[in-house]
Design a protein with these regions (language model features):
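Terminal intrinsically disordered, low-complexity extensions flanking WD-repeat/beta-propeller proteins
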Residues: 2-25, 211-231, 288-290, 297-299, ...
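A short helix->beta-strand "capping" segment at the edge of beta-propeller domains
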Residues: 11-40, 70-72, 231-235
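Short C-terminal beta-strands that terminate individual repeats in beta-propeller domains
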Residues: 30-35, 73-79, 116-122, 160-169, ...
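Beta-strand-rich domains and repeat architectures in extracellular enzymes and scaffolds
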Residues: 32-61
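Canonical WD40 repeat/beta-propeller blade segments in eukaryotic WD-repeat proteins
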Residues: 35-46, 81-90, 125-133, 169-184, ...
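Short coil/turn segments that connect the beta-strands within blades of beta-propeller domains
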Residues: 50-52, 92-95, 137-139, 187-189, ...
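Conserved strand-to-loop turn within each blade of WD40 beta-propeller repeats
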Residues: 57-60, 99-103, 143-147, 155, ...
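WD40-repeat beta-propellers
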Residues: 63-67, 106-109, 130, 150-154, ...
């Protein structure tokens, strides 16, 4: 019979260290973890209760509605038999739930009744990103896939309106989509797409047409000479390139005056791309390792990813304010739970490959308390381990000493033998 125990297979020292660290962290209860039956790949606020409820996409092939205060599953949306990767809400009264899946389709349900609605079939590979908008009186669904295509749908009829592909710069697998709330109008959506390449693209979409939106060069651009040369030659800059490799998340800061674009990348950074500077990077946050997720508040920039750590940065100074080390596998998504009436402080919700959903206070006092709790627990555990090692060494030494000692009977026999030799 073959063994599935990892310890029975060849592992590098790094792999062993990671596995041992994961085993140590697995039992922790920081963030009041809710353990789900499968990996959690995405999370969005519940539009009906954004301060206390979320929707999560699970690798087990379902979407769950979770009350973050009671830690209970209040609804299950089923149908897919493969992982669900991404979520969005839209449609009439924001009452339709959309979910992209590994089965190459987008599923939809009535958010209130859980009744399955239409499926959108048009991609030739995994669907990895979905977002909703409106064009005139029509609700619109936009999906992006591993097939390197963006598809725009009439959400009501299921009719495919457009298929977007970059004709000049190779666009890889789609990772995330966002709608620009400043440039979009009643009859036109400006879509931002991120993919498994360094290029961020913008698209102008109407019911009848679409085009790739050039990036406006300004004298304040990073390279004014290059901007002037491009302008004089008639060349258009069609992509924003501020990262070195894949961009996993794009997020507009709707709380800020300029509504700048924020990004998270596999190059280990999160960045603020400033609208008035043609989306050139201004603030850079060096998270380290792949950054899968980013969330924003008035005070903080929050990042998470493969390192398993949540890092909280001061928005004003850029300083690292806190490191929350609780998940024991990759963090896949972050979302801020915000009371629309402002009656309660913001709360961060994090989800990951470790099958857990956790929540964290984002007020200064609450955040400090969490960091101190994790630090104190780590110190106590380290002391326990040191004591255990000392005890183990002491027992080993005692055994060695005992092995070197003879019983009274053995000593008498040895003395008799020595007398016989004399």
């Amino acid at each position: 019979m073959e063994s599935s125990n990892q310890e029975n297979f060849f592992e590098t020292d790094t792999q062993q260290a990671k596995r041992h660290l994961r085993a140590k962290k697995e039992a922790n209860t920081f963030g009041n973890p809710l353990r789900m039956p499968s990996k959690i790949l995405a999370v969005i606020p519940d539009p009906k209760k954004p301060q206390s409820s979320v929707l999560i996409a699970e690798s087990g092939g379902r979407v769950s509605r979770i009350n973050t205060e009671t830690r209970t599953t209040t609804a299950k949306y089923t149908g897919p038999s493969v992982p669900v990767t991404c979520l969005a809400t839209g449609g009439a009264s924001n009452g339709v739930l959309f979910a992209g899946s590994w089965d190459k389709t987008v599923w939809s349900w009535d958010l209130a009744t859980r009744r399955p609605l239409r499926r959108y079939d048009g991609h030739s590979d995994f669907v990895k990103a979905v977002v909703c908008g409106r064009l005139g009186d029509k609700p619109i669904l936009v999906s992006g896939g591993a097939d390197k295509k963006i598809i725009v749908w009439d959400a009501d009829s299921g009719r495919k309106l457009h298929t977007l592909q970059d004709p000049t710069t190779t666009m890889m697998s789609l990772q995330h989509l966002a709608i620009d709330p400043v440039l979009s109008t009643a009859d036109e959506i400006v879509l931002v797409s991120a993919s498994s390449d360094p290029h961020i693209r913008r698209w102008r979409i109407t019911l009848d047409s679409y085009s790739q939106l050039p990036v406006d060069e300004t004298p304040s651009s990073a390279d004014p000479a290059a901007a002037a040369a491009a302008s004089s030659s008639g060349e258009e800059k069609l992509t924003i390139q501020e990262h070195e490799t894949s961009v996993y998340k794009v997020l507009f800061d709707v709380m800020g005056d300029e509504v700048d674009l924020w990004t998270a990348s596999a190059d280990g950074t999160a960045k603020c791309l400033v609208r008035e500077r043609a989306f050139a990077a201004e603030d850079v946050f060096e998270h380290g390792d792949f950054v899968r997720a980013i969330a924003l508040t008035a005070d903080w920039v929050v990042t998470g990813g493969i390192s398993q750590q949540i890092k909280v940065w001061d928005r004003t100074s850029g300083a690292l304010r806190a490191v929350v080390d609780a998940h024991f596998d990759e963090i896949t998504d972050l979302v801020v739970l915000r009371d629309p009436a402002g009656r309660s402080p913001d709360v961060l919700c994090s989800v990951g490959i470790d099958c857990t959903l956790r929540t964290w206070p984002l007020d200064h006092k609450g955040l400090d308390a969490v960091v101190e709790e994790i630090r104190a627990a780590a110190e106590a555990k380290a002391e326990d381990e040191q004591e255990g090692e000392k005890k183990k060494k002491g027992e080993g030494k005692k055994e060695e000493e005992e092995e070197g000692l003879m019983t009274a009977e053995e000593e008498a026999e040895l003395a008799a033998l020595m007398e016989d030799d004399d």
